[in-house]
């Protein structure tokens, strides 16, 4: 486990929770184990997975893996009414307290699980939260991505991030988690839950 992953695991108290935006292109079949973070330690992400970043540019995971820095991966969606923002805020508060610089020592990757979200939505998300990462280099070290269903499904399956569309709440139900990746794109840890998050 990387120094960064270990620090965040210790710095952010865990509290199991789940939260469910707008209607997806199709309903995700809810399973018994849906809306949970499964153990995916040791899995290496496919570097050919293709997304679009907050600037509207194509972004393949090979732009990060293999690389020189570990990566903190956050999955969720940007129109999430509460929890996704709370996870990001808690992560940024912890990262602001550690003696490591974004871009030099680690990178941050946000990926939306909602295939209807656009680069403009991703850009707005970044503009809202970037000031909370009180570190120089944060803008270039943090990519905020959107993608199609196929690439989203491949990424979430590989990382063990399970979610579904709730017709009851008209939102995505998903686990709060941070996933830690080596510079080679291998999953080495996950933080399941962040203190202070509600359902």
Predicted regions and their residues:
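N-terminal "domain-start" segment that seeds a small globular fold
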Residues: 26-63, 86-96
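Extracytoplasmic
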Residues: 44-46, 66-70, 103-108, 139, ...
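Thiol/selenol-based redox catalytic cores and closely related redox-interacting motifs
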Residues: 132-199
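Hydrophobic h-region of N-terminal signal peptides that target proteins for export
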Residues: 8-18
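Short active-site neighborhood of thiol/selenol oxidoreductases, capturing the structured segment around
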Residues: 61-91, 108-110
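Sec-dependent signal peptide recognition
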Residues: 1-7
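Structural microenvironment flanking redox-active thiols in thiol-disulfide oxidoreductases
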Residues: 88-152
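Cleaved targeting-peptide boundary
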Residues: 18-27
């Amino acid at each position: 486990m990387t120094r960064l992953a270990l620090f965040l695991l210790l710095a952010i108290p865990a509290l199991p929770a789940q939260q469910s935006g707008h209607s997806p292109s199709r309903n995700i079949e809810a399973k018994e184990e849906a809306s949970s973070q499964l153990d995916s330690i040791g899995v290496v992400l496919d570097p050919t997975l293709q997304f679009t970043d907050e600037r509207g540019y194509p972004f393949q995971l090979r732009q990060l893996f293999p690389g020189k820095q570990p990566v903190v991966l956050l999955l969720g969606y940007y129109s999430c009414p509460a929890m996704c923002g709370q996870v990001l805020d808690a992560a940024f508060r912890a990262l602001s307290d550690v003696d490591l610089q974004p871009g030099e020592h680690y990178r941050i990757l946000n990926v939306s699980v909602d295939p209807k979200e656009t680069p403009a939505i991703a850009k707005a998300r970044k503009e809202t939260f970037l000031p909370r990462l009180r570190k120089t280099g944060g803008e270039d070290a943090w990519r905020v991505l959107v993608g199609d269903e196929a690439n989203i499904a491949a990424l979430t399956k590989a990382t063990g991030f399970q979610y579904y569309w709730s017709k009851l709440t008209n939102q995505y139900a998903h686990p709060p988690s941070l996933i830690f990746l080596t510079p080679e794109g291998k999953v080495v840890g996950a933080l399941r839950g962040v203190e202070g998050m509600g359902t």
